[in-house]
Amino acid sequence: MAAQRPLTIALVAGETSGDILGAGLIRALKARVPNARFVGVAGPRMQAEGCEAWYEMEELAVMGIVEVLGRLRRLLHIRADLTRRFTELKPDVFVGIDAPDFNITLEGNLKKQGIKTIHYVSPSVWAWRQKRVFKIGRSTHMVLAFLPFEKAFYDKFNVPCRFIGHTMADAMPLDPDKNAARDVLGIPHDAHCLALLPGSRGAEVEMLSADFLKTAQLLRQRYPDLEVVVPLVNAKRREQFEKIKAEVAPDLAVHLLDGMAREAMIASDAALLASGTAALECMLAKCPMVVGYRMKSFTFWLAKRLVKTEYVSLPNLLAGRELVKELLQEECEPQKLAEALLPLLANGKTSHAMHDTFRELHQQIRCNADEQAADAVLELAQ
């Protein structure tokens, strides 16, 4: 009598964030099904958990239109090869982790072959290009969503979706230790502290840094003891920021940090930041914030027509109201930014109310996402 085939899960991750999610999912599945087999496109973390890599994740990790066009033939070859090999393997479930442009078509190919498919991490269909939801519905048996309003969106279109909570919410404490973070950064416990996070992309740092620095100068006039911390994502962004600072605010003393954004947020009384994942992380760090964002006029004009949400920052989308101030385009200027930040630095009623709401929202999305994702995979595999 032939031995029963072990549970076989195929996965494709296209970037580092997907590799982290994939590794957490594999770990949770192995705890329940120790002999399960994992194959696909994997990064170093997934491979360390035992995933057999048919292709290295770096093959898919291309950014920007020019880079994608340059690699298009190779990407199409990989997708066709994976379709063929997964069809032959017939895994119990296929999990496409993020990388929607690559994975959703692959999921559709496999679903047609009778393979059960999951898309892990919803694209921002609720915000723009909403018609993508129909392709997602045709291509997948289940979407795993980090945020509750994403599930509500899919429910409207009868696309099966499971809210699993956010892995970042699982990783961060409900009550971070501000003084411990200040000790790490060398910030006095009794000083006022402001974090500036002008973004991770070059264009964001270029557009926002000068106004963020001028805002800090205005706030320093009100709070002479103000410590300013600026975490920068890499050496290139740091060099870019230093050049802008030398022109705009050469005399402003700041703590420039290599990475360490989370520590900076936890240590600070308030943060001024570009939108994006940083706003969610800042909320989970319980740091009151103001979102300031500017883009080229045509890009903003286009975005206003494409984006369907009332707010741009995740804390506001989660709260369903303007919990944090969003100052966009011409509103994103030093005087208005400083006015919005002043009550937060005062550590009074405004910042305490914001902190309490941040904690409530943290609890809402802290659901042990790795375990929830594993539940979804095993239920679909049955």
Swiss-Prot record:
Pathway: Glycolipid biosynthesis; lipid IV(A) biosynthesis; lipid IV(A) from (3R)-3-hydroxytetradecanoyl-[acyl-carrier-protein] and UDP-N-acetyl-alpha-D-glucosamine: step 5/6
Documented EC number(s): 2.4.1.182
Domain of life: Bacteria
A GO CC term attached to the entry: membrane
Enzyme class: transferase
Glycosyltransferase among keywords: yes
GO BP field: lipid A biosynthetic process
Regions annotated as coiled coil: none
InterPro entries cross-referenced by the UniProt entry: Glyco_trans_19
GO molecular function: lipid-A-disaccharide synthase activity; phospholipid binding
Key words of the record: Glycosyltransferase, Lipid A biosynthesis, Lipid biosynthesis, Lipid metabolism, Transferase
Catalysed reaction equations from the record: 2-N,3-O-bis[(3R)-3-hydroxytetradecanoyl]-alpha-D-glucosaminyl 1-phosphate + UDP-2-N,3-O-bis[(3R)-3-hydroxytetradecanoyl]-alpha-D-glucosamine = lipid A disaccharide (E. coli) + UDP + H(+); a lipid X + a UDP-2-N,3-O-bis[(3R)-3-hydroxyacyl]-alpha-D-glucosamine = a lipid A disaccharide + UDP + H(+)
Pfam families to which the protein is assigned, alphabetical: LpxB
HAMAP family documented for this protein: LpxB
Recorded family membership: Belongs to the LpxB family.
Reported function: Condensation of UDP-2,3-diacylglucosamine and 2,3-diacylglucosamine-1-phosphate to form lipid A disaccharide, a precursor of lipid A, a phosphorylated glycolipid that anchors the lipopolysaccharide to the outer membrane of the cell.
Protein name per Swiss-Prot or TrEMBL: Lipid-A-disaccharide synthase
Species, as recorded: Salmonella paratyphi A (strain AKU_12601)
